[in-house]
Amino acid sequence: GLPSTVVPADECRRAIRPILNKINDLSPDFLVVEAGASPLEPYNGAVLLEELGDNLVCTILCASDPYAVVGVEQAFGLRPDLVTGPATQTSAAVDLVERLSGLQGINVIDPAMKGAFREFLERKLGVSCKKTPGAEAPGGR
């Protein structure tokens, strides 16, 4: 694999394009992409965002704290659709995310928030995430 966080942006871009073209040829309904990026370090997250361009339908920011949400918005000029991560691990943190940024925050590792996350995905992606009988993941999860 390519250590995309440590190569120059042009090299990263040259590596990403054939991968995205191959994925496009497969005509997937959705593509979930994870990009580790810091606005303060050259991790090539911005390159990936540029390459995906108008194909981005939903952006979920996993932020370390509520103030990082504002910092990422300012540094990348990107307004995420949802905030998760340590910035949402308490109700006070979720409230602060919403107060500072106006964005919804959901603690996706809290089983009680599973329904809220499902509703968010259904609304944002325009699909139904209802369980299909007998379609449980391995291990019953």
Please report, for each region that a protein language model flagged, where it lies by residue:
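P-loop NTPase switch/communication element
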Residues: 1-8
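Active-site charged/polar residues at nucleotide-handling catalytic sites that mediate phosphoryl
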Residues: 26
